[in-house]
Amino acid sequence: MVPWVRTMGQKLKQRLRLDVGREICRQYPLFCFLLLCLSAASLLLNRYIHILMIFWSFVAGVVTFYCSLGPDSLLPNIFFTIKYKPKQLGLQELFPQGHSCAVCGKVKCKRHRPSLLLENYQPWLDLKISSKVDASLSEVLELVLENFVYPWYRDVTDDESFVDELRITLRFFASVLIRRIHKVDIPSIITKKLLKAAMKHIEVIVKARQKVKNTEFLQQAALEEYGPELHVALRSRRDELHYLRKLTELLFPYILPPKATDCRSLTLLIREILSGSVFLPSLDFLADPDTVNHLLIIFIDDSPPEKATEPASPLVPFLQKFAEPRNKKPSVLKLELKQIREQQDLLFRFMNFLKQEGAVHVLQFCLTVEEFNDRILRPELSNDEMLSLHEELQKIYKTYCLDESIDKIRFDPFIVEEIQRIAEGPYIDVVKLQTMRCLFEAYEHVLSLLENVFTPMFCHSDEYFRQLLRGAESPTRNSKLNRGSLSLDDFRNTQKRGESFGISRIGSKIKGVFKSTTMEGAMLPNYGVAEGEDDFIEEGIVVMEDDSPVEAVSTPNTPRNLAAWKISIPYVDFFEDPSSERKEKKERIPVFCIDVERNDRRAVGHEPEHWSVYRRYLEFYVLESKLTEFHGAFPDAQLPSKRIIGPKNYEFLKSKREEFQEYLQKLLQHPELSNSQLLADFLSPNGGETQFLDKILPDVNLGKIIKSVPGKLMKEKGQHLEPFIMNFINSCESPKPKPSRPELTILSPTSENNKKLFNDLFKNNANRAENTERKQNQNYFMEVMTVEGVYDYLMYVGRVVFQVPDWLHHLLMGTRILFKNTLEMYTDYYLQCKLEQLFQEHRLVSLITLLRDAIFCENTEPRSLQDKQKGAKQTFEEMMNYIPDLLVKCIGEETKYESIRLLFDGLQQPVLNKQLTYVLLDIVIQELFPELNKVQKEVTSVTSWM
């Protein structure tokens, strides 16, 4: 009987859905209590039902309103005076969606190569900032080069060409970053994505605070709460550096010029500079609690913003001054458009290059307009000529101005309108083009495109290098036999590249440069090379010491007495080496400047003569060797020991200046050298320079030497074997490594590198090993959370951090429909105002200066502990004052203090700040470079398939 009654009760309970009613009563107790009271009053006081109907109508309206709208229905913004408008930038017109073609101007152009997109080639075009901000950024980048490039680069060479390329690359990177920042809506990213990540971070801190009572252990407890969800860069400092390297490599295709990633050495250098020397200290600076406090004060400070003490500086092109080349001598590979057009073979190569780029019609437009101008500028035009010109103009308009044309070139709208008006009008109006500027400006625009975009690209193309080496691709034997070495005359005779084109003329001789080698002034043995292949001897310069009175710098038949000459070496200078062996580098080498005063011709009525001669370090030893060969050794005139290994740079030559000056002065005092032709040539500006350019340590073709060793051993049959082996070992022995400066970034676990990588603030981050087993904590990040927008974030913080009472939480849920959109619109507006204040010129310069000091001023005194504590105290007070008084009355003063203290303590943990910084950095990188999301999806799909 009892089971039957129980079964009937369960069925009745299910039919009446009592569980649902009980759940409704639990969630809405106040509403259910009022509804129950109203129902009881209606039954007991049915005589007053007409009065109670007012309350029943109100309940019915509330239920209908709630059911019709639902919690997801939101009222629009009710503050009509506050409207947030995303930034409308002129940059977007120049680069719509970042896909504006440099030729036709079309969005997502499919005709021309992606490398022709203006953003991909010259992203700094029309990008201007205030001169003070530009100067601050330039100073930071100059310090990057001065601290991480020049210390080792100056030991290699003094040529600035490579550093100039690096400057352009850094400008390209900064310009791309600025342009991509301009394209995103910063307030929307902050409110929709960054704050959501911050909510997750706050939840972890709250959970950790519940487990520890002392603030000192809050950071470690929070790291344990993160568990396996801790960012990979936080495991250790080395993992952080490795992560930044990988991130930099991922960004290279988007932040470097096209084809720059093909140069592995350049990408490695830039990766180490950016990851280890820029990004790592910058993130340390941002995660520093002192920096966080400073930024919080700027954000929550309601006082009027500090006004600039100086007027706004003028706008200047972005980093133009920083990117100006320091190497004054132009590159030997540089060409001008005029030079290309003057040579048929170069013009043919250039047209092939344009054809590959899909832009041959750009050159065709220039040629067509030039021909058109020649015809239209004639004094008197007949009707037939005007008709022909009008037809030609119509072809130009249809071919290069219409949007549907495949050969469209982007012009300013007024140019297109003027050309269209003449092309569609009567033919006699074509003469108006003689005085109109539209066609001339179109021509100037296309000519600028050819000169500034395509000509530099052509100078780095395969077509141009084929032109340079067209004689070296299949060199004949005769070309090698004629001359094996190159002299300065090959370059001196080349006055104009457009006339004789010196590089291509001597290109066929390059292959024979490295055939014979010299070690310490002696020729290496001939190792039995194949007959007919390398059986020639490099042309040498025979020097004969003639004591006859033949003048080097004066008229003939005049006696010469070198003892009466006065010489001095006042300074060391730089000389651009034009020798063919170094034609690729064109390096600037240090030389001694020898001032010569000739006084030996006063007897015949001549005034003293003065001139200067520039001699290299090794030329002195060639002079000493040849003087010893002809005259024997001079015990009182000896050069210091020759430096074989190690840099012979400016500082080294400067230290040897006095010794070399004393050596020359003593040579002049020797009677047997008073009429020496060799010494006179050395001191003469045109006295046989090439005879002193002895190759002391040239390149050795080790491959051919090693191949020839067995044949040489068989031919020698043991004779003179020991000297041969010694010479062979000496020629093949690698030079001793030069002492290097401290590394750019940290690769090896040395004490010096550890000192740079680890610091007292962050130590070793979370100090986790890769194979450490970590506890699988509750994964907050996989939980379903319907928190979206600032209103929901405030409710979440109020519930989790400030522990608002239930009635206030329900009230906020009720007003969510009314005020959510309004609050979020106001928040976007407020953030935009704060960002505008932050990006004011004087504030931006101040932030850049702080960043500069944090990265480069390692030797300066950091902020004292008292200053940091004072800043932290001010931040806490500002946070306390930022909470509205109405909320304080609802939650209480004590709860307010504890909640603010919890948030403040969480921001004073450097490693936790670094965790939040990297999470936010990942979000920002994905917003700035959405292409990375596609790459990640492709990698994920491939991984899942495998």
Swiss-Prot record:
- Membrane topology of the entry: Multi-pass membrane protein
Transmembrane segments annotated in the record for this chain: 24-44, 49-69
Q: Which GO terms describe its molecular function?
A: phosphatidylinositol binding; phosphatidylinositol-3,5-bisphosphate binding
GO BP terms, alphabetized: autophagosome maturation; postsynaptic modulation of chemical synaptic transmission; protein transport
- Which UniProt key words apply to this protein? Cell projection, Disease variant, Endosome, Intellectual disability, Lysosome, Membrane, Neurodegeneration, Phosphoprotein, Protein transport, Spinocerebellar ataxia, Transmembrane, Transmembrane helix, Transport
Q: Which residues carry this modification: Phosphoserine?
A: 548
Cite the SMART domains for this sequence. PX, PXA, RGS
Q: Per the database record, which ranges form the PX domain? A: 570-690
**Which stretches make up the RGS domain?**
336-468
Q: Which protein family is it in?
A: Belongs to the sorting nexin family.
Described function: Plays a role in maintaining normal neuronal excitability and synaptic transmission. May be involved in several stages of intracellular trafficking. Required for autophagosome clearance, possibly by mediating the fusion of lysosomes with autophagosomes. Binds phosphatidylinositol 3,5-bisphosphate (PtdIns(3,5)P2), a key component of late endosomes/lysosomes. Does not bind phosphatidylinositol 3-phosphate (PtdIns(3P)).
What is the name listed in the Swiss-Prot or TrEMBL entry for this protein? Answer: Sorting nexin-14
Q: What is this protein's gene name?
A: SNX14
